[in-house]
Amino acid sequence: MSKKQQGYNKATSGASIQSTNASYGTEFSTETDVQAVKQANAQSEAKKAQASGAQSANASYGTEFATETDVHSVKKQNAKSAAKQSQSSSSNQ
């Protein structure tokens, strides 16, 4: 086998490993940052709830299953939400 062929084989095997990682790498990863995933899910749910105006749904389901809820940030978000609601209700009168 010439050096040229060895280089080609290395290049193709590397490419196939990368494509395998692209399709399976994160799906079955053992080092998933669970807290980051939960936080991202909670943020996604909060955005959906705000967009649809269903903030009460977020209050009843959003934090119910969280293991490490940041109480301070939840209170802060609730205060913002209450402020927005009072602004919109006063402008509607």
Curated annotation (Swiss-Prot):
Keyword presence, Transcription: no
Biased composition (Low complexity): 38-60, 79-93
Coiled coil: none
Protein name as catalogued: Small, acid-soluble spore protein gamma-type
Region of interest (Disordered), ranges: 1-93
Source superkingdom: Bacteria
Ranges of the Sequence repeats in the UniProt entry: 18-52, 55-89
Chain intervals with Polar residues compositional bias: 1-33
Site-annotated residues for Cleavage: 27-28, 64-65
InterPro entries: Spore_gamma
Family according to the record: Belongs to the gamma-type SASP family.
Protein purpose: SASP are proteins degraded in the first minutes of spore germination and provide amino acids for both new protein synthesis and metabolism. These proteins may be involved in dormant spore's high resistance to UV light.
Pfam families (alphabetical): SASP_gamma
Keyword field: Repeat, Sporulation
GO biological process, one term: sporulation resulting in formation of a cellular spore
Keyword check for Repeat: yes
